Amino acid sequence: MIPGELFIQDGEIELNAGRKTVTLTVANTGDRPIQVGSHYHFFETNPALKFERKKARGMRLDIAAGTAVRFEPGQTRDVQLVALAGKKTIYGFRGDVMGKL
């Protein structure tokens, strides 16, 4: 093996298979771009992002780990969210939950 070498299987890799998902329309009503990372609790994103926030509780973006979605000022786009896994406890972010979902 060479350092940094990757061994990739043939075929497609399905992310988050079998998890609950929801698609929301999100609008950036602010005057600055807002970027949201793959594992950020979407319910707690910047208040300038307008969407059906209650539907995002316990959800994150359904994108590859380590990537992000950027919302430009005035932009509206649809995003797919996926349910968080694990113990379903949320700490940090904006401090809106701080415990079990």
Swiss-Prot record:
Keywords: Cytoplasm, Hydrolase
CDD domains, per the entry: Urease_beta
Single GO molecular function: urease activity
Catalytic activity: urea + 2 H2O + H(+) = hydrogencarbonate + 2 NH4(+)
GO BP annotation list: urea catabolic process
Subunit structure: Heterotrimer of UreA (gamma), UreB (beta) and UreC (alpha) subunits. Three heterotrimers associate to form the active enzyme.
The protein's name in its UniProt record: Urease subunit beta
Native organism: Bradyrhizobium diazoefficiens (strain JCM 10833 / BCRC 13528 / IAM 13628 / NBRC 14792 / USDA 110)
